[in-house]
Design a protein with these regions (language model features):
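An active-site-proximal "capping" alpha-helix that borders the catalytic cofactor pocket
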Residues: 17-24, 62-77
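Short, flexible helix-adjacent loops and helix caps
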Residues: 29-30, 52-56
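Active-site metal-coordination segments of metallo-dependent hydrolases
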Residues: 5-16, 54-67
Length: 152
């Protein structure tokens, strides 16, 4: 919250992604270690946006993936996090939907998409396409169908 002081939209986005990620992970029975890393990555997943705006005048997802890990590293090291490599990997790949390695990675993608669909007023047709191609977890699929009232 401190990092995005004054920007309620970004703060709320991070909190919503975190809450979806945590809920999906618990229902998918993710172990405590991976859950901790996933929650950390979820709350920080868009942390590179400010740098991207200053450096590129853009908030494009691939640029966030490029710049986010360095910002996150500084924050996590200041908080005495020890094993940060997976968290940084997740932050650096959360807009990459191919070669998804790990349940934590899949859940972060799904949580971010659920929030983005709502925030960007994504059409049901587009949501259905993304659902069919990207969503993999039982819980993420269920949430997507129920939240956006999509039928298959």
């Amino acid at each position: 919250i401190k990092y995005n002081h004054g920007n309620a939209k970004r703060i709320n986005h991070a909190l919503k992604v975190h809450n979806y990620a945590k809920t999906i992970a618990i229902l998918e029975k993710v172990n405590e270690y991976d859950l901790f890393n996933l929650e950390s990555a979820a709350i920080l997943h868009d942390i590179g946006i400010k740098v991207c705006e200053k450096k590129y005048n853009s908030t494009e997802g691939k640029l966030q993936e490029k710049e986010g890990p360095a910002v996150a590293r500084e924050i996590l090291e200041n908080l005495d996090y020890k094993n940060i490599n997976r968290i940084l990997f997740l932050i650096g790949h959360h807009h990459t939907y191919i070669n998804v390695s790990g349940l934590d990675y899949q859940i972060l993608i799904e949580a971010d998409l659920l929030v983005n669909f709502e925030e960007e007023n994504t059409s049901k047709e587009d949501i259905k396409k993304v659902y069919e191609n990207i969503f993999k977890t039982k819980t993420g699929k269920k949430f997507c169908r129920e939240i956006f009232d999509i039928s298959l």
